């Protein structure tokens, strides 16, 4: 270019010849060898870019240094000339004339704008510094990640290189071991001219630009044979040439040459990176018989467009080699967490461990136990096997399905006060239900059969002063209802012991005291019937001292209140004492959780189905909840209060009737709400299974010990009175069964074929017919079809409303099965004076009656020398050849015995009568 440019000369000078870039392509020809002596000449083109001196691979990017944001540059100078500001704050123009004076507002606005600008400047600077710091951290993390990836890549390449080296050594060793014919000859000293490929750089920085096209091309395999070096039927042990070499990379450009037998071959790169000289071309010679074996014919070789496919035999040999390597490789042991129940079969245990059942059985055999895969082993043995095989064990039990149902600890911050639960207990006819009626302003006594309580009931009463609700549970006082009283004491907070002032402490009063002590709940004594003229409350307090109940008036800590249910005297004070005791107990619970409760009573209602009276103790029971109680489950269809109102939910200490069970649960079962039906089915199936196992164990256990065998021998001849019992509620049925069980003796006992809740059905009649049993209905009736079937088959059905009438009738019927008692009544004695032998009659003894009377047909004993030699009946009694009915003392008569004639003079005959006396239980 000239030193000076002419402004008007803009013409571009173009040389006479167009400039072009010469393609840097290196070409050459190589000969590619194929199995079975075939070869092909190909042309290889190598394209790439030349490296300039000083070029190098770009260095890895470095994280920039954290930059500190600089303050923005000052604003450009104003076009107006800047002059000194006048002292008066006036701005002057170019001529020095004051244009306008700034007001105070404008000056304050300008100062505020400057302050805001400084704040923004500081904020932007801080954000820039934060962004620079984050960018530096991010780039440092990326750099560390790249370095780790590069290290992994290098390790992977090194591993692949070692694997290829080991594989190549193994193939060479196999070639030496299994090769046939002469050894390969050394390569010629003067190799054929080939296209020399540049050696591969060790690392990426030495690689030229355009790396994908600049790698050395590998056409032949590393073990390409020199001419005639391999036997006719042998193949090289290295990789096949058609695969592009061991690295599996295709050549940059391969074109088939016109002549397949001429031309040089490419230099092959070894695993270490150094170039090896290509072997000399194959020499053409006449193949011998061994060279010809296993090769293609000339026509097939000339007509083939591609290399020959792999033979089946070669594929099989390779498969066998791979199988051998796989067998030699030790598999990694899989350690599993094995869940072991209480009992498990060997096959199932092996499946859970992913082991062979044969190995498990072999392990058991080493321990001296012979088993089959279908045998059941216990959890301890299964745990030993699993740990021996290197697995971890998780022991589970069938009872785990009940975990989390009850007694879940609540957070103290979620609790709130609840109403107290009070159980009223006492002896029969001491006024428990009447006292509750007076508190509830109701009349339950008139609804009970016989005026006695035979059901457990739960009610809620509101205290008049505080307005708090108190839940009362009324229990029967009769001896037959012990289980009911015990159940009431378990779910209660306070026990109110009702004692009649005119009757004092009675047996069921003592039992109620024991129940309260066993439940460890406080007690309040209500001395009832103080309105009677013969009431003596002081005697009641004194009698309670004998049973370790010391009231406050006698220096104790038990509260006592004198009340009258008839006149409603001191009822307010009784409620006040109950509320005071509840405040002392500080009763709290969590209502915002799934409900828990206790089944107080259960029955089978004909119109509503199974109905259970439930006392909710924790949480809230809602309509639609899935509930479990004992071996029964269901979904809550309705909640009915003690007043008959339908509720949507019931909180703690609220008694409700629950509808929706599949069957009536047993009284005393705990109720819980579960999350779904699947969990409910698991719990109920487990409990039903436990109940069946317990029943089977009780039956099989009766044959266990020697004492049980002796008791069975005693009861082997015991008579049984079969019964089918149906009751209205579970509690009454429980009381009936307990009372009938007490009636049994060693000679006779009641056999309960079936006991259930609900009306009498046809199936009950059919069952009773099969065992010739009686049917008893307590507060229930048989339906029309069952009554007709019982009448047709002669099955007796008896109905009762009072439990004592039922027990008395069954007792009388069972007494009829007892064997009667035989009692002897002495009539008289006679002495034999002479023995006569009469032809048609036999021997007849002539006797004199010494005392009493001898009657014909009475029982006699023949005594000889104070030893009884015969017992029988008197068949003939005559006096002077006349048959007489009896003979008095001092008279003589003739006697003959039935089927006996060995009578001697001097023998004594005792005459007695046997009386049959009917026994009773």
Curated annotation (Swiss-Prot):
Which UniProt keyword terms apply here?
Cytoplasm, GTP-binding, Initiation factor, Nucleotide-binding, Protein biosynthesis
Its domain of life reads: Bacteria
Region G1: start-end pairs: 426-433
Q: Which residues bind GTP?
A: 426-433, 474-478, 528-531
What the entry lists under InterPro entries is as follows:
EF-G-like_DII, EFTu-like_2, IF2_assoc_dom_bac, IF2_II, IF2_N, P-loop_NTPase, Small_GTP-bd, T_Tr_GTP-bd_dom
Report the residue ranges that make up the tr-type G domain in this protein: 417-586
Q: Where is this region: Disordered?
A: 1-296
Q: What is its main location?
A: cytoplasm
Amino acid composition bias (Low complexity), ranges on this chain: 80-89, 184-237, 248-257
Record's GO cellular component, any one?
A: cytosol
One Pfam assignment = EF-G_D2
Q: Where is this region: G4?
A: 528-531
> Region G3: what ranges?
474-477
Spell out the Gene3D superfamilies in the cross-references. Answer: P-loop containing nucleotide triphosphate hydrolases, Translation factors, Translation initiation factor IF- 2, domain 3
Q: Where in the cell is it found?
A: Cytoplasm
Keyword Nucleotide-binding listed? The answer is: yes
- Region G2, annotated ranges: 451-455
GO MF annotations, alphabetized:
GTP binding; GTPase activity; guanosine tetraphosphate binding; translation initiation factor activity
Region called G5, residue ranges: 564-566
* Annotated Basic and acidic residues bias: 117-183
Recorded coiled-coil stretches: none
User: Which HAMAP family does this one have?
Assistant: IF_2_B
Q: Give the NCBIfam families listed for this entry.
A: IF-2 (TIGR00487), small_GTP (TIGR00231)
Q: What does this protein do?
A: One of the essential components for the initiation of protein synthesis. Protects formylmethionyl-tRNA from spontaneous hydrolysis and promotes its binding to the 30S ribosomal subunits. Also involved in the hydrolysis of GTP during the formation of the 70S ribosomal complex.
This chain belongs to the protein called: Translation initiation factor IF-2
């Amino acid at each position: 270019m000239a030193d000076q440019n002419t402004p008007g000369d803009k013409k571009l000078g173009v040389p006479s010849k167009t400039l072009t870039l010469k393609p840097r392509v290196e070409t050459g020809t190589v000969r590619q060898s194929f199995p079975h002596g075939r070869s092909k000449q190909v042309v290889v083109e190598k394209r790439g870019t030349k490296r300039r001196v000083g070029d190098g691979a770009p260095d890895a990017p470095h994280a920039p240094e954290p930059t500190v944001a600089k303050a923005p540059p000052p604003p450009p100078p104003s076009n107006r000339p800047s002059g000194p500001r006048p002292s008066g704050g006036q701005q002057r123009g170019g001529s020095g004339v004051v244009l306008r004076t700034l007001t105070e507002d404008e000056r304050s606005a300008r100062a505020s704008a400057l302050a805001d600008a400084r704040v923004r400047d500081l904020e932007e600077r801080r954000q820039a510094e934060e962004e620079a710091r984050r960018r530096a951290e991010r780039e440092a993390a990326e750099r560390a990640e790249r370095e780790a990836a590069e290290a992994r890549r290098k390790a992977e390449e090194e591993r692949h290189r070692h694997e290829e080296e080991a594989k190549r050594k193994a193939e060479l060793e196999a070639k030496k071991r299994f090769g046939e014919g002469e050894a390969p000859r050394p390569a010629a000293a003067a190799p054929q001219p080939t296209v020399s490929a540049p050696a591969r750089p060790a690392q990426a920085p030495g690689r030229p630009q355009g790396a994908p096209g600049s790698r050395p091309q590998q056409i032949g395999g590393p073990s390409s044979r020199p001419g005639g070096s391999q036997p006719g039927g042998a193949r090289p042990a290295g990789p096949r040439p058609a695969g592009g070499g061991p690295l599996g990379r295709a050549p940059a450009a391969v074109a088939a040459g016109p002549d397949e037998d001429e031309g040089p071959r490419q230099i092959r790169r070894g695993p270490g990176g150094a170039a090896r000289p290509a072997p000399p071309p194959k020499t053409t010679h006449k193949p011998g018989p061994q060279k010809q074996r296993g090769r293609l014919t000339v026509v097939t070789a000339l007509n083939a467009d591609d290399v020959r496919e792999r033979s089946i035999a070669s594929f099989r040999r390779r498969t066998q080699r791979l199988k051998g390597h796989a067998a030699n490789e030790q598999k990694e042991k899989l350690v599993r967490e094995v869940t072991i129940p209480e009992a498990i079969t060997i096959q199932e245990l092996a499946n859970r461990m992913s082991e062979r059942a044969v190995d498990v059985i072999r392990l058991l055999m080493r321990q001296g136990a012979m088993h089959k895969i279908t045998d059941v082993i216990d959890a301890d043995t299964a745990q030993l096997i699993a740990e021996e095989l290197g697995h971890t064990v998780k022991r589970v039990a069938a009872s785990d399905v009940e975990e989390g149902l009850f007694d879940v600890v609540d957070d103290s911050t979620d609790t709130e006060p609840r109403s107290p639960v009070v159980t009223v207990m006492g002896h029969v006819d001491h006024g428990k239900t009447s006292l509750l009626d007076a508190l509830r302003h109701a009349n339950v006594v008139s609804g009970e059969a016989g005026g006695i309580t035979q059901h457990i009931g739960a009610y809620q009463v509101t205290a008049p002063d505080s307005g708090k609700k108190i839940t009362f549970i009324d229990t029967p006082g009769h001896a037959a209802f012990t289980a009911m009283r015990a159940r009431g004491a378990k779910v209660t907070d306070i026990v109110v012991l009702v004692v009649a002032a005119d009757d004092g402490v009675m047996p069921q009063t003592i039992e109620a005291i024991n129940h309260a002590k066993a439940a460890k709940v406080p007690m309040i004594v209500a001395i009832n019937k103080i309105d009677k003229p013969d009431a003596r409350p002081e005697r009641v307090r004194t009698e309670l001292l004998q049973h370790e109940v010391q009231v406050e008036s006698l220096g104790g800590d038990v509260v006592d209140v004198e009340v009258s249910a008839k006149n409603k005297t001191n009822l307010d004070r009784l409620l006040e004492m109950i509320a005071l005791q509840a405040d002392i107990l500080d009763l709290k619970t969590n209502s915002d959780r799934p409900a828990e409760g206790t089944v107080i009573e259960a029955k089978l209602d004909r119109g509503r189905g199974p109905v259970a009276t439930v006392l909710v103790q924790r949480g809230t029971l809602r309509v639609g909840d899935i509930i479990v109680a004992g071996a029964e489950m269901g979904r809550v269809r309705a909640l009915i209060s003690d007043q008959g109102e339908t509720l949507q939910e019931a909180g703690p200490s609220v008694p409700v009737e629950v509808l929706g069970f599949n069957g009536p649960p047993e009284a005393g079962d705990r109720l819980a709400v579960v999350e779904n039906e699947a969990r409910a089915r698991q719990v109920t199936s487990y409990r039903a299974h436990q109940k069946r196992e317990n029943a089977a164990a009780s039956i099989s256990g009766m044959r266990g010990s020697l004492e049980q065998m002796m008791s069975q021998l005693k009861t082997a001849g015991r008579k049984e009175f079969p019964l089918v019992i149906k009751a209205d509620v579970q509690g009454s049925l429980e009381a009936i069964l307990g009372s009938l069980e007490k009636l049994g003796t060693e000679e006779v006992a009641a056999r309960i074929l079936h006991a259930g809740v609900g009306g009498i059905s046809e199936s009950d009649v059919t069952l009773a017919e099969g065992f010739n049993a009686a049917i008893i209905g307590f507060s229930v009736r048989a339906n029309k079809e069952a009554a007709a079937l019982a009448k047709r088959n002669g099955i007796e059905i008896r109905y009762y409303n009072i439990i004592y009438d039922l027990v008395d009738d069954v007792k009388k019927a069972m007494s009829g099965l007892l064997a009667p008692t035989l009692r002897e009544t002495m009539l008289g004695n006679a002495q034999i004076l002479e023995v006569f032998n009469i032809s048609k009659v036999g021997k007849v003894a002539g006797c004199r009656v010494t005392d009493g009377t001898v009657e014909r047909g009475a029982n006699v004993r023949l005594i000889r020398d104070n030893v009884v030699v015969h017992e029988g009946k008197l068949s003939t009694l005559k006096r002077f050849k006349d048959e007489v009915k009896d003979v008095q003392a001092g008279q003589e008569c003739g006697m003959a015995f039935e089927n006996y004639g060995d009578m001697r003079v001097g023998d004594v005959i005792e005459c007695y009568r046997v009386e049959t006396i009917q026994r009773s239980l």
